Regions:
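Residues in the recognition helix of alpha-helical DNA-binding motifs
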Residues: 310-313
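Short alpha-helical "recognition helix" segments of helix-turn-helix
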Residues: 293-298
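Structured, helix-rich domain cores that form ligand/interaction pockets
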Residues: 1-289, 317-335
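Residues in the helix-turn-helix
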Residues: 306
Length: 335
């Protein structure tokens, strides 16, 4: 398995005025988004630069502050064309090039605001795992879907809108997201996402892990205040942040897959106490037909605190698909 780390997208946000956004609307082709009944709050999108890596969102309000948001795909912006799988690794040199291209786009749409006035509103820490087969992507996606949720995090399915039930079920089948108030974590099949959303086909089998940090979390993690310096600082911490998050999910990079029979053999031959072995066997057997580790904990009737401790020590997880008898064990049990 090959891993590739970097930045997929980030967003910049700055305060504006009603009249300034009105001038931008006059000069550019805008797509109208949601608005309230009396048009006191309106949302617009400038999609002319989306293929080049920048989507511009305008929030125009008579009763609240108005905002301009830039959603930036830095790899596409620097390449001047859409890069579906490339991840950005910022350096001081590439950041200068990035700011130059952003300044050019802002001048073209008629926004005179300095780039320094923008704030980093969202940052996506991204890790792409490359597998040899699509079945491996589905297998690991199922493992994540069955993982133990951390406190204050909740699963966030795709909203059911005007799309058909088939598309809605397909989206939730190929992606999994959990979130709290300040960050969200998504795992999804990148090839499926590109095919369905962007009509782009790729040969690579990629499982994308994406940790999205909000403005609140960014301010806690960064000592710098300028958005360009924050990008550099966050990128330096990215590996440690992602590894820490995966560790909290009890799914570190060191985890490996074994069969159901192998799992029982590992438990039997380990140096664990007989009482612990008995509980681990119960967990493995109950995991065979449960949809999540939370359901396993209820069926085994092991105390929640003890169950979490055992997950931390032994990192047991099982694939969601019953026909695929795989159990992932961490190095602690296998040692």
């Amino acid at each position: 398995m090959k891993c590739n780390d970097g930045i997929h997208t980030f967003s910049l946000k700055t305060r504006s005025s009603y009249s300034e956004i009105q001038n931008i609307r006059v000069q550019n082709a805008c797509i109208r988004g949601k608005r309230d009944l009396f048009s006191l709050n309106q949302n617009f999108c400038i999609a002319d630069y989306k293929d080049k890596g920048v989507e511009i969102l305008l929030h125009q309000s008579l009763v609240h502050p108005s905002w301009v948001t830039l959603i930036v795909n830095p790899s596409s912006l620097l390449a001047d064309e859409y890069q579906p799988t490339e991840l950005f690794r910022p350096t001081e040199q590439t950041m200068k090039q990035l700011k130059t291209r952003l300044r050019t786009i802002l001048d073209e749409i008629g926004l005179a605001t300095r780039l320094k006035a923008f704030r980093l509103a969202r940052y996506n820490q991204t890790r792409d795992r490359y597998y040899n087969h699509a079945s491996e992507v589905a297998l690991w996606l199922g493992i994540f879907q069955k993982s133990w949720l951390m406190p204050r995090y909740a699963a966030v399915p795709f909203p059911k809108d005007s799309e058909s039930d088939v598309k809605w079920k397909g989206a939730n089948q190929h992606a999994w997201t959990i979130a709290n108030k300040s960050c969200a974590f998504s795992v999804y099949d990148k090839a499926y996402e590109l095919k369905k959303r962007h009509k782009v086909k790729i040969k690579a089998h990629i499982l994308r892990l994406e940790l999205r940090l909000s403005r609140k979390r960014i301010r806690k993690l960064c000592h710098e205040t300028d958005w360009d310096k924050q990008l550099l600082e966050l990128h330096e911490k990215q590996d440690a942040q992602l590894d820490k998050f995966l560790h909290r999910l009890h799914l570190p990079e060191s985890i490996r897959l074994v069969t159901f029979t192998q799992a029982l053999e590992i438990i039997d031959t380990s140096r664990l106490r007989e009482k612990t072995k008995k509980k681990l066997r119960r967990i493995v057997k109950k995991a065979n037909g449960c949809e999540s580790l939370a359901a396993v904990q209820k069926k085994t009737r092991i105390k929640k605190s003890e169950f979490i401790t055992m997950l931390g020590q032994h990192r047991i997880i099982r694939q969601k698909e019953p026909s695929c008898q795989h159990i992932a064990f961490g190095r602690t049990v296998c040692a």
